[in-house]
């Protein structure tokens, strides 16, 4: 990613995998259940490879430490997510919402605490009776790019220089 200089913007899509034994957030509150999206890399890649190709510099799995405040106390959530590095000015990602969803922009630090990225945490609020996991395997797909740069020749040059996804 260094060959693109500092003109990069990084997004983290946070993964929540019940198979790892993690409990849903707010599992002690029967009225409000919040789930991180869960997906495999293959699903994620198929959904984004074509749509993000002109702007994506790298996609890789990274450990995440989310922070959130509840009842005036700060909680830390350890997990994993996919980091997407986009060439700034070529496009911005928007999420498709098949259900009513709340997307929160948070901050996270790597374990070394040297790097900071923006974190997009897709969450769905549902009742306890709906929290059976059947429809929560993939809450949000990264679906489309809004180009911010009208210079198509510049877009083609960057895409040609970048080659394929790393």
Swiss-Prot record:
- Domain of life, per lineage: Eukaryota
Give the protein's recorded name: Protein UTR5
């Amino acid at each position: 990613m260094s060959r693109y200089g500092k003109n990069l913007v990084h997004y983290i899509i946070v993964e929540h995998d019940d198979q790892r034994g993690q409990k849903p957030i707010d599992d002690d509150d029967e009225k409000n259940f919040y789930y991180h999206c869960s997906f495999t890399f293959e699903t994620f890649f198929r959904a984004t490879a074509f749509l993000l190709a002109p702007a994506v510099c790298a996609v890789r799995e990274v450990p995440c430490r989310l922070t959130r405040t509840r009842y005036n106390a700060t909680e830390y959530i350890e997990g994993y997510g996919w980091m997407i590095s986009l060439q700034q000015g070529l496009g911005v990602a928007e999420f498709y919402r098949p259900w009513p969803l709340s997307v929160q922009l948070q901050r996270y630090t790597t374990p070394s605490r040297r790097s900071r990225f923006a974190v997009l945490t897709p969450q769905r609020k549902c009742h306890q009776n709906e929290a059976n996991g059947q429809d929560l395997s993939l809450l949000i797909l990264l679906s489309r790019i809004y180009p911010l740069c009208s210079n198509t020749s510049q877009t083609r040059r960057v895409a040609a220089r970048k080659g394929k996804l790393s």
